[in-house]
Amino acid sequence: MIDMRSIQKSFGANIVLNGVDFEVLPGEVHALMGENGAGKSTLIKVLTGIYERDGGTIVVNGREVHYRHPKEAERDGIVVIHQELNVIPTLTVAENIFLGREPKIGRTGVIRYKEMEQQAASYLRRLGMDLDPRELAGRLSVGKQQMIEIARAISTNAKCLIMDEPTAALTEREIQALFSVIPTLKQQGVAVVYISHRMEEIFTICDRISVLRDGQFIGTKRVKETNFDEIVQMMVGRQIGERFPKRRVTIGEERLRVERLTKKGLFENVSFSVRAGEVLGVAGLMGSGRTEIMEAIFGARPFDEGDIYIDGRPVRIRSPRQAVEHGIAMITEDRKQKGLILEMSVHENLTLPKLEQLATAGFIQSSKERDVVLTYIHLLNIKASSPDLPVKALSGGNQQKVVFGKWLAMNPRILILDEPTRGVDVGAKKEIYEVINELAAQGAAIIMISSELPEVLGMSDRVMVVHEGKVQAILENDGLDQETIMRAATGGNR
């Protein structure tokens, strides 16, 4: 259906795509993989007419094309479903599906709502979705809004859906709903290009995997004929060893204890502890209250009652400043909104929490600042052409490393990580895991929220499972499996 050959694209002297080949067959699910900055997004933008290619050919349905706008690609059945969904919350499900293509009475401009709602219901049924076409889209979950986008694509007679990190903001149940829709699309001859860093998903639903590295096409493999290690080596150009690096840490005394922490409507009677050198994994479905509990401990969210102890002593924390004073740092799941100031440089972001220590008589000592910046750029292997580069210019993985560096610079004794590797490629994940292990080895107590159960199992000493704002279970990670965690996360027996 789609055949891209020898695609070239440069921005100035920077070669972003260098002779890339990419082929998509009708009715297949084809993963497009590569580290952050490998060229995946640029390739899709070239395909759909957002960027003009410098060289190479694109053939769609046997005809060479040269799209100038995504609308032209859509007319040929190529539709992109972006990570940031394009759903208008104040319109109904049906209005979103037919936006700009509403059936009307002659030339009057009057919309035939009943017909539109019936057609919308028909497209939703094709996806196995029982959604009311008259429901306001803003009242639906992210997963159901994503189904609206898929229904919209099918209504335009889409032949190829390009999904960019489609499960990043979905609950486990919504992910399963998406996975049940994809075979339906395949049966209807619709191809799916699936862009994701989540290996488990790739090997579950994809037929073939194509890998880019540093703007070059490395190869295509059939999922049945490859494995995790081979794909990782294709992506990073080297063997990265064990997926989750082993730790040799002696777990020390209790560092943090929380008792009966409660915020009405969000979480209730939460009690747990974490020791020096320990990694406590926190699992639970999206919306279970995991993040809200940790925000309360960090002083970013008020709570009604409960006590927090550090090294056995009660502490009062009502703001992030007070948390930082007690040696607590928190790396948030939304790095762009809460973790970074995107317009500021790498070095400015790295030194934000440490400005007081870098100042003498109220003036920042530039030599001290430079030493701190270079130390953490080197330690975390942050790929930036200059420390003065705006942090928004970095890849997702390198942005996440800057967030880590920002808080590591204050030498935290307790580090709370909320989805630390979301949207990060496999090579950068391994580097982040090694940093977590190093911090634990230095005696920090680590709390790690993650929706990726292999990550929870691979990195944690114990796992706390949260369900509907309550601690459902605290499990030793000795022979623990994903099924046991999911059973607790859905309210089942421990």
Curated annotation (Swiss-Prot):
SMART domains membership: AAA
Protein species of origin: Geobacillus kaustophilus (strain HTA426)
E.C. number: 7.5.2.7
Enzyme kind, highest EC tier: translocase
Molecular functions (GO terms): ABC-type D-ribose transporter activity; ATP binding; ATP hydrolysis activity
Protein's UniProt name: Ribose import ATP-binding protein RbsA
Family per record: Belongs to the ABC transporter superfamily. Ribose importer (TC 3.A.1.2.1) family.
Reactions catalysed according to its record: D-ribose(out) + ATP + H2O = D-ribose(in) + ADP + phosphate + H(+)
Its membrane topology: Peripheral membrane protein
PANTHER family assigned to the protein according to its UniProt record, in alphabetical order: CARBOHYDRATE TRANSPORT ATP-BINDING PROTEIN MG119-RELATED, D-ALLOSE IMPORT ATP-BINDING PROTEIN ALSA-RELATED
